[in-house]
Amino acid sequence: GLDKTTERRDFNGDGDGRALVTVLEQAKKRGMRVGVVSTARVTHATPAATYAHVNERGLENDIAAQALPGDATFNKRLRGGLDLLMGGGRRYFCPSGMTDEEGESCSRTDGRDLRQEVQDAGYSYVYNRAEFNLLRKRDLPVLGLFDRSHMDYEYDRPYDLAGEPSISEMTSKAIDLLEGKRRDNKGYFLMVESGRIDHAHHASNADRAMVETEEFDKAIATALRKVDLRDPLIVVTADHSHVFTMAGYPLRPLHDLPYAPVSAPADYLDNTVDHSGILDVVYGISASSGEISAAGDKDSVPYTILGYWNGGNPYDTGAAGVYRDMALGRGDPRRD
């Protein structure tokens, strides 16, 4: 079983060395179409767990080769291969020493260009938003790789030069492509991951995490609109929780601090009531001036509305400046 003694090196198997059957392998065995969509690299942990078998999650070159038909390293339990694979991680599909479509370096060490191999096998390959928008049902199977590594945060996506689709757009397109002609379709299994919510939290960036979550909510709403719920099953879950906690008892909306009440309701002024200010930070807002005081409101009642932190100092001077500014939105106080 899985407990605190499980080590990172442990293999995803049944204990005697045999690889477990993945959910996409089961779907393929039933004759279903299968697809994977992620805003992270398509070779990252969550998407890879649906179709690949490796001893270590970091073996992303091997994971990429297992997803699509090419040579003996392909996961033959997937039969003809994934019908649809969209997300980031382009560098694991092209050989080192070569640059990709956006001039970024590739990472494969075996000299293989999986992008060309899958096109030779009948796949449609797209790498930007314009090509993505042109995809039609007849273009299945499809490989879409929209970034060298993880796709951009939703907040930053409009600034991508090549153009990237959003997770809600990829969800909509994937459903259209996988449904195909209903008369010859035995159904489909689609896994959609909003992988960058987690990344924003690890960077202690509450704002980008919230924007990612909002876009994921749009993706769920898109799926609910597009399918007939008398037949498909839509499951929304998470692989773990995170550090974003709404707490306290603010009467003001989160986005409109100047309009806070001067004091808390009377029942919260009773010393027998737990005030649950998660961060033990006391702020007061004057309804007349809108100014924030570190001393609290006139009754010294904490108005903590957000408990949030993950990891070390996000402004660590030892970190790469470009990454730090990208992740934390430094220079834009609304993003910190």
Kindly label every feature range from the protein language model.
Residues 1-60, 73:
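Active-site nucleophile/metal-coordination loop of metallo-enzymes that catalyze phosphate/sulfate
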Residues 43-336:
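A post-motif C-terminal structural segment
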